[in-house]
């Protein structure tokens, strides 16, 4: 079976925001 590439989520602890890399 083929798996979808898992999006890497980077969370910045300073701003408290998470963004996809």
UniProtKB/Swiss-Prot annotation:
It comes from Podisus maculiventris (Spined soldier bug). This is Thanatin. The lineage of its organism: Eukaryota, Metazoa, Ecdysozoa, Arthropoda, Hexapoda. Insect defense peptide with a broad spectrum of activity against Gram-positive and Gram-negative bacteria and fungi. No activity against S.aureus. Stops respiration in bacteria but does not permeabilize their inner membranes. GO terms for cellular component: extracellular region. One of its GO terms (biological process) is killing of cells of another organism. It comes from the Eukaryota. Four regions are important for the activity: the C-terminal loop, the last three C-terminal residues, the stretch of seven N-terminal residues and residues 8-9 are necessary for the antifungal activity and dispensable for antibacterial activity. Keywords: Antibiotic, Antimicrobial, Disulfide bond, Fungicide, Immunity, Innate immunity, Secreted. Disulfide bonds join 11-18. It is found in: Secreted.
